[in-house]
Amino acid sequence: MALTVMASSATAAAPFQGLKSTASLPVARRSTTSLAKVSNGGRIRCMQVWPAYGNKKFETLSYLPPLTQEQLLKQVDYLLRNNWVPCLEFSKEGFVYRENSTSPCYYDGRYWTMWKLPMFGCTDASQVYKELQEAIASYPELRAILGFDNIRQTQWLTFIAYKPAGSE
């Protein structure tokens, strides 16, 4: 079998010039006046930063009326159906404050104090409600119930379960 050598002929190709011209495509032209003013939204009043001082540490929907016992049990039941561990927390102050340090850290008042231990193995919303009533009798400050996912190790749900009279 004889070896054959093929000679390739080199052809001159034009260098790459980019994509096709878009001159034939319709283009929406913006007026130059719309780009003349660049704004970060400084004139918008509905997007202001929440004041950091003098605010209660209530959660997202805390402006709503207090939950009834039935609504509270439904929330806890939802928490349990998702296999989250219920925990009770309370806050004596209700305000963000710094007592021992001027730098932000764990003990600067942004975190609530946990009531007893998380309720691992809890399967009934009435157990959580009974524990909430015991917590209210012992410390009549603000109470929150949270749902903790011990697999992902994250908090998935928090809501205000009890606000003492006179708190806003």
UniProtKB/Swiss-Prot annotation:
GO terms for biological process: photorespiration; reductive pentose-phosphate cycle. One of its GO terms (cellular component) is chloroplast. SMART domains: RuBisCO_small. InterPro entries: RuBisCO_ssu, RuBisCO_ssu_dom, RuBisCO_ssu_N, RuBisCO_ssu_sf. It is found in: Plastid, Chloroplast. It comes from the Eukaryota. Pfam families: RbcS, RuBisCO_small. The keyword Phosphoprotein does not apply. Residues 1-45 form a transit peptide. Its main location: plastid. Keywords: Calvin cycle, Carbon dioxide fixation, Chloroplast, Photorespiration, Photosynthesis, Plastid, Transit peptide. SUPFAM superfamilies: RuBisCO, small subunit. The basic functional RuBisCO is composed of a large chain homodimer in a 'head-to-tail' conformation. In form I RuBisCO this homodimer is arranged in a barrel-like tetramer with the small subunits forming a tetrameric 'cap' on each end of the 'barrel'. PANTHER family: RIBULOSE BISPHOSPHATE CARBOXYLASE SMALL CHAIN 1, CHLOROPLASTIC (PTHR31262), RIBULOSE BISPHOSPHATE CARBOXYLASE SMALL SUBUNIT 1A, CHLOROPLASTIC-RELATED (PTHR31262:SF10). Belongs to the RuBisCO small chain family. Heterohexadecamer of 8 large and 8 small subunits. RuBisCO catalyzes two reactions: the carboxylation of D-ribulose 1,5-bisphosphate, the primary event in carbon dioxide fixation, as well as the oxidative fragmentation of the pentose substrate. Both reactions occur simultaneously and in competition at the same active site. Although the small subunit is not catalytic it is essential for maximal activity. This is Ribulose bisphosphate carboxylase small subunit, chloroplastic. The lineage of its organism: Eukaryota, Viridiplantae, Streptophyta, Embryophyta, Tracheophyta.
